[in-house]
């Protein structure tokens, strides 16, 4: 797809005659084209002060603020964040030093043959307690360093859900009219909307769950060991053998394990499959819902005035730079009650996913969108083409 998009956006063999060359669009035409794209691909469009792809233009006052932050906040925050990362890596290294990693029964096929999932999340005892508690604490400290000094968390009144969905409560009335409390079912997964890589830090600080990650993450310096302590599910999307179970199969097993085994790590899933600008909720993939177990919906919102921390069209380097430059960042969290599926939802994962998605959109005041990752890639490729035309236009004017 990427090669096709490149063919659409550029010509490898430009015409030799000047008359045959396509005229460059005026700057106003390009601005109108980008505005039209933003409307079509609204879930991925940036609406903050930093503009499309974070490229501005910036007001003079903003340039001054960025210049001051570059020589004050950025170096300090960078050093502190790297120190925290290194400290937690050392904690994980020390407390897993004489422990063999857990090798799950699930297998995946890659170029090197059959490989096993490996993690330290199945450890028990005081060593595991130290890893989890220090991980949660340092994740919150890291968010503080990034400017998230306060995180507002809210839990909608669970009592309001008792009439509409009796399964959301574990308290029943016995024959004598007394409240008989039963132990609630453990959710098989936490499901959340996906706005930024910062989502992971929040969830680590709140519940320290496992995540789905590329297999290459497990081999990264520092982060690789930390991901194993989280119990990440590593996937190799390029591997497709006859026995390959795929991402859904592996996730399904982990969800069932987390639901039935209290000592197993809870798994955290972003069913949208990609990030948005935080105002929309994309179509959910069914991986978190195939097992038919209860899920815990969590909604993350990042209010902003200048720079939006949503990771939509902006590059990773620019995003981190502007994040470190912003003095204060905001995060609001809505933790919904555990959602217990009906029998109909258990039998139909798509219905289950759709109903949870609608609930999250209603409670989080999010707009439903049917776009997906492929649309985001098209949007990015088209934006890159238009912006390259803008650069050509300015060069011609000069």
From Swiss-Prot:
**CDD domains, alphabetized:** LPLAT_LPCAT1-like
Q: What's a single GO BP term from this record?
A: phospholipid metabolic process
Task: Report the domain of life of the source organism.
Answer: Eukaryota
Cellular localization per UniProt: Endoplasmic reticulum membrane
The topology of this chain with respect to the membrane is:
Single-pass membrane protein
| Top-level class of the enzyme under EC nomenclature | transferase
User: Which residues does the record list as Phosphoserine (modified residue)?
Assistant: 28
Q: What is its main location?
A: endoplasmic reticulum
Question: Compositional bias (Polar residues) spans?
Answer: 163-174
User: What does the UniProt record say this protein does?
Assistant: Possesses acyl-CoA-dependent lysophospholipid acyltransferase activity with a subset of lysophospholipids as substrates. Exhibits strong acylation activity on lysophosphatidylethanolamine (LPE) and lysophosphatidate (LPA), and lower activity on lysophosphatidylcholine (LPC) and lysophosphatidylserine (LPS). Exhibits acylation activity on both LPE and LPC. Has a preference for 18:1-LPE over 16:0-LPE as acceptor. Palmitoyl-CoA (16:0-CoA) is a better acyl donor than oleoyl-CoA (18:1-CoA). Among several different acyl-CoA species the best acyl donor is palmitoyl-CoA (16:0-CoA).
Name-wise, this protein is Lysophospholipid acyltransferase LPEAT1
State the organism named in the record.
Arabidopsis thaliana
